[in-house]
Amino acid sequence: MKNSLLNYIISFVAVLISVSLGILTGIDEVRNGIILSFIIHWLLFIPAYVFKTEKFYDLTGTISYISIVLYVLLSSTDGIINFGNMIVSSLIIMWTIRLGTFLFTRIKKAGEDKRFREIKKSFSWFFMAFTISGMWVSICAICALTGISNGIELTGVTYIGIVIFIIGFALEIISSTLLDKSIVCSSAILSFSSA
């Protein structure tokens, strides 16, 4: 009982922090996107708990990320989507699909995500895990959501950001491929990748 209460308190704080950050942007679409992230996580938590499976936990984050980016992109532009918004949204969605697919495939091959052996047995603990995933999506996406809602202009800084994204994305793919082949990336620049 004591642990259950703590799990619910942590979940409440995660939502409070995330939604508060959304409110602080002063942009309704960003706040609503953050709320949407939690709704998606909680809706997908239901079948996950009923079937005691973590197999689509990472896909929940993927679906949430794509949904909130598209929501903000389409709701904050009054039907006029500028090229900068399209580029940033496309890069985020591309990264999200790659990471989500990699994580889902890895868990599918392994048969389970060992982190969830005990977690998925407890309603409050599993709920907290899904809620914290909603927080992770919200906090990681909030800067991009704010930029998209304000309209991203293509400037030199934007192009530098795109180049940095491409380099980081390539390193992440290389690292994931090596990790998938059980090659440890402990030297040179690949040691910094978090795959």
Identify the role of each PLM range:
Residues 1-193:
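Membrane-anchoring alpha-helices and their flanking helix-loop junctions
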